[in-house]
C-alpha cells in the first residue's frame, strides 16, 4: 500500500469547522510536504480549483500548478499528483508546462485529470463550461494531445476541440512513455474513458466491499478496451479520524458532521449535485467532510484503522489519498501509529513465495 494525502490548498477539509489550524499558505504546505516524505508518505494530491470549495468561495485557496512547481524544487522523493481540468488548460501548453515541472522534480510529476463540475467558478474565470458527457468527449481528445506531445518529436492533431500543427515539445518528461495519469468518475462515460485512456482509477470513500466491486468492474472494462494495456492501478480517498478509543473517534465524527455549525462551505452544494453523476446520493452530512471521506470508514483506534486499510488492500487498492485535520499533527500520528501496523498486517501478502 502506498500512502498519499491531499495537500490542504483550501485550508482544511471540514465544511462545518471554519478554522482547522492549517492556513492555505505556501509556508504551511511547504513544511507539510517536506515533513511528509520524511515520515513515510509517498504522494501528495494537489487539487485544482480557483475558488475555495471547502471554506466558501470568498476564502483563500492556493493555485495547483504554481504550487506544484514550487514543491518540485523543495522536495526529494514525494510524488506530486496535480489535478488538471481540460477546460481550463489547452493541452499542448499544459503538456509543456507539466514536462518542465517533471524535469524540475526529477520525474515525480503525475496528473489527476478531472472534468469540471463547478459552473459558477467557470463563469467567474471566463472558461467554457461543457455539459457532462461533452466534458468527457473533450477530455478524451485532450488526453490524446497531451500524450502525443509527450511522445512524438513533432505532433499534429485536428479534432473537434483542439488543433495542433507540427508542434515540438522538448525536453520530454522524465517518465516514459509518459507520467502516470490518474482519473476518477462514476458515470459510464467517465469509467469507459478511464479504462481506455488512463493508468489508474481513483475512487471517493466507500466501504472495502463496494470498492472491490468497482475494482472488478474497472478491470473488466480495461480488458474490453484493449487487452494489451497494462493493468490499472486503484486509489481510494478517505478522511482519517484516529483516537485513543473508538468512542473518542466517534465523538469527533459527530462534531465535524454537525451541519448547523457553518453555512459558508455549503454555498456550492446544489451546483455540485447538479453537475455530477454519482452512483449514490450524498447527504449534507456526507458533504460536510470533503470527498465523502468518512465513507471509507477510517475512523477509530490505530489498530482499527490499520485493519480497515488491510481490507482495502485485499480489495485491490494500492494507494490511499488521505485527509486529516489538523493535518500536520494528525499525519505525524498516522505515520507513527498506523503505518507500522499496516506494514505488519500486509507483510504476508507481499512476501515472495519460497
Regions found by a protein language model. Name each.
Residues 13-26, 83-92, 175-186, 240-243, ...:
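Active-site mouth loops of central-metabolism enzymes
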Residues 1-74, 174-179, 353:
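N-terminal beta1-alpha1-beta2 module of alpha/beta enzyme domains
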Residues 3, 36, 40, 71, ...:
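Conserved, mostly hydrophobic/aromatic
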Residues 5-9, 38, 125, 132-174, ...:
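An alpha-helical appendage that flanks or caps ligand/catalytic pockets
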Residues 3-5, 44-46, 80-84, 109-113, ...:
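Hydrophobic faces of well-ordered beta-strands that scaffold small-molecule active sites
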Residues 55-81, 138-145, 336-350:
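Alpha-helix-loop-beta-strand connector modules within alpha/beta enzyme cores
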Residues 37-38, 68-77, 98, 102-109, ...:
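Acidic (Asp/Glu)-rich catalytic clusters
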Residues 23-36, 94-97, 184-193, 301-312:
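Short, acidic/polar
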Amino acid at each position: 500500500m502506498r500512502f498519499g494525502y491531499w495537500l490542504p490548498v483550501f485550508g482544511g477539509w471540514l465544511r462545518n469547522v471554519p478554522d482547522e489550524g492549517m492556513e492555505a499558505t505556501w509556508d504551511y504546505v511547504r513544511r507539510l510536504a517536506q515533513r511528509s516524505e520524511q515520515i513515510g508518505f509517498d504522494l501528495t494530491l494537489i487539487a485544482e480549483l480557483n475558488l475555495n470549495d471547502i471554506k466558501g468561495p470568498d476564502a483563500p485557496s492556493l493555485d495547483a500548478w504554481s504550487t506544484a512547481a514550487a514543491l518540485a524544487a523543495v522536495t526529494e522523493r514525494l510524488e506530486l499528483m496535480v489535478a488538471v481540468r481540460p477546460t481550463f488548460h489547452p493541452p499542448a501548453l499544459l503538456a509543456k508546462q507539466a514536462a518542465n515541472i517533471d524535469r524540475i522534480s526529477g520525474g515525480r510529476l503525475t496528473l489527476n485529470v478531472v472534468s469540471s463540475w463547478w459552473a459558477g467558478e467557470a463563469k467567474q474565470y471566463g472558461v467554457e463550461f461543457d455539459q457532462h458527457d461533452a466534458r468527457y468527449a473533450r477530455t478524451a481528445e485532450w488526453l490524446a494531445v497531451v500524450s502525443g506531445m509527450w511522445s512524438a518529436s513533432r505532433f499534429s492533431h485536428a479534432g473537434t476541440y483542439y488543433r495542433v500543427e507540427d508542434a515540438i515539445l522538448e525536453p520530454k518528461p522524465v517518465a516514459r512513455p509518459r507520467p502516470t495519469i490518474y482519473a476518477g468518475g462514476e458515470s459510464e462515460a467517465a469509467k469507459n474513458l478511464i479504462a481506455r485512456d488512463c493508468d489508474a482509477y481513483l475512487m471517493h470513500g466507500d466501504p472495502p466491499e463496494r470498492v472491490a466491486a468497482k475494482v472488478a468492474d474497472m478491470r473488466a472494462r480495461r480488458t474490453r478496451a484493449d487487452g494489451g494495456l497494462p493493468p490499472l492501478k486503484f486509489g481510494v480517498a478517505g478522511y482519517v479520524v484516529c483516537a485513543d478509543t473508538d468512542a473518542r473517534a466517534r465523538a469527533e465524527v459527530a462534531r465535524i458532521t454537525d451541519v448547523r455549525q457553518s453555512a459558508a462551505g455549503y454555498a456550492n452544494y446544489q451546483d455540485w449535485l447538479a453537475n455530477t453523476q454519482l452512483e449514490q446520493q450524498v447527504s449534507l452530512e456526507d458533504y460536510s467532510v470533503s470527498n465523502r471521506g468518512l465513507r471509507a470508514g477510517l475512523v477509530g483506534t490505530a489498530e482499527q484503522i490499520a485493519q480497515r486499510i488491510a481490507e482495502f488492500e485485499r480489495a485491490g487498492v494500492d494507494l490511499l489519498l488521505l485527509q486529516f485535520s489538523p493535518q500536520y499533527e494528525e499525519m505525524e500520528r498516522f505515520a507513527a501509529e498506523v503505518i507500522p501496523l499496516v506494514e505488519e498486517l500486509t507483510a504476508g501478502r507481499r512476501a515472495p513465495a519460497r
